[in-house]
Amino acid sequence: MPEKKGSADAKVLHCSFCNKSQHEVRKLIAGPSVFICDECIDLCNDIIREEAQATARAAIRSELPTPAEIKTFLDQYVIGQTSPKRMLAVAVYNHYKRIRHGEIKGDEVELSKSNIMLIGPTGSGKTLLAQTLARMLNVPFVMADATTLTEAGYVGEDVENIIQKLLQNCNYDVEKAQRAIIYIDEIDKISRKSDNPSITRDVSGEGVQQALLKLIEGTVASVPPQGGRKHPNQDFVQVDTTNILFIVGGAFDGLEKVIRDRTEKSGIGFSAAVRAKSERGVGELFSEAEPEDLIKFGLIPELVGRLPVVATLDELDEAALVQILTEPKNALVKQFQKLFAMEGAELDVRPDALKAISRKALKRKTGARGLRSILEGALLDTMYDLPSQGNVSRVVLEANAVEGDGKPLLIYADESEAASGEKAGRGEVRDAAA
């Protein structure tokens, strides 16, 4: 006679790992001739998580460079800006040392996080500094634009979208994401319009600053899995931002006037000291920035207090722009020389052309960001014709081509072209317009 289901003699299933019966655990999952309970699954997850954390801690211990090594690495990619580099190197070193220190149990002293604010004119290297730091430290890096952020519930991106982008960059490895660097650009564009508290709601200005406070200081952010929308009944990915280093940057156009008004008050009447407005440059004025200046500019005091390290970048002059064109590892001239080498031609950018490019960028007031468009414009016609001309061995760029008064010179490798060039007068050099 077959056994009745649920009778006392029915077969009781046991976990193949801990041997607990199905009545002692909440869930028993069946596989091919084996079973595993929910308690063993939790234990396996804990073991995997501990191993991942140990790997991440070992990576931080073994790869933490000294401030001098960080600055040396930054020097290879970013020209000038010595003081900001030193400040960044020390702040980043102390941040990751703090993470290591926090893992030591039983220590009474807790080290607070030192987030960084970069202030400098457009094209001075703020974004490049943050990107280079992340590349050196081999940590996840994400860049966000503050101008697209709004308060939660309004059309636009809320601040938690930044953490969502970070998780996507890390393939949803939460442990790795919690040691990342986040760079928020254009932070000055979310300043409030007045230094007095606003009565009406400012969802893209002061409201965003309020939303960023806890994220920057350290909180557990709930992010929808795989970038989905938020639903009440779904499980969220929990990301602790306590050990994430936040770097914010902005051009702060108009801050120099706030600083000048504070530092150059000289009274009235015959005893007043008369000073020229243009005595000091923007970079020099930025170096004297105080928290009160940033608050008057439009940042709320709470946000300024959570960004204790303020590094100011100098304006780039002509000499610095020439260095940027030629000296860094990924210098612009080196990039174009590699492009021309792929076509079998050598690119020679003369010193007077480098100076002409730098002067043009200074007139545009775009800093180093405008160098590529100027160089691209000067070489555009040549790059268009070069693939069709297989006998060009060298391209010479001079100042007149940059200024629009001529074309780059082409030197041909073909002997017949050289011979015809000699009849015309001067060797094998021909104008690109020919």
From Swiss-Prot:
The lineage of its organism: Bacteria, Pseudomonadati, Pseudomonadota, Betaproteobacteria, Burkholderiales. Zn(2+) binds at C15, C18, C37, C40. Coiled coil: none annotated. ATP-dependent specificity component of the Clp protease. It directs the protease to specific substrates. Can perform chaperone functions in the absence of ClpP. One of its GO terms (cellular component) is HslUV protease complex. It comes from Bordetella parapertussis (strain 12822 / ATCC BAA-587 / NCTC 13253). The keyword Nucleotide-binding applies. InterPro entries: AAA+_ATPase, ATP-dep_Clp_protease_ClpX, ATPase_AAA_core, Clp_ATPase_C, Clp_protease_ATP-bd_su_ClpX, ClpX_bact, P-loop_NTPase, Znf_CppX_C4. Component of the ClpX-ClpP complex. Forms a hexameric ring that, in the presence of ATP, binds to fourteen ClpP subunits assembled into a disk-like structure with a central cavity, resembling the structure of eukaryotic proteasomes. ATP binds at P121, T122, G123, S124, G125, K126, T127, L128. Belongs to the ClpX chaperone family. GO terms for molecular function: ATP binding; ATP hydrolysis activity; ATP-dependent protein folding chaperone; protein dimerization activity; unfolded protein binding; zinc ion binding. Pfam families: AAA_2, ClpB_D2-small, zf-C4_ClpX. Keywords: ATP-binding, Chaperone, Metal-binding, Nucleotide-binding, Zinc. GO terms for biological process: cell division; proteolysis involved in protein catabolic process. The keyword Zinc applies. PANTHER family: ATP-DEPENDENT CLP PROTEASE ATP-BINDING SUBUNIT CLPX-LIKE, MITOCHONDRIAL, ATP-DEPENDENT CLP PROTEASE ATP-BINDING SUBUNIT CLPX-LIKE, MITOCHONDRIAL-RELATED. Signal peptide: none annotated. Residues 3-56 form the ClpX-type ZB domain. This is ATP-dependent Clp protease ATP-binding subunit ClpX.
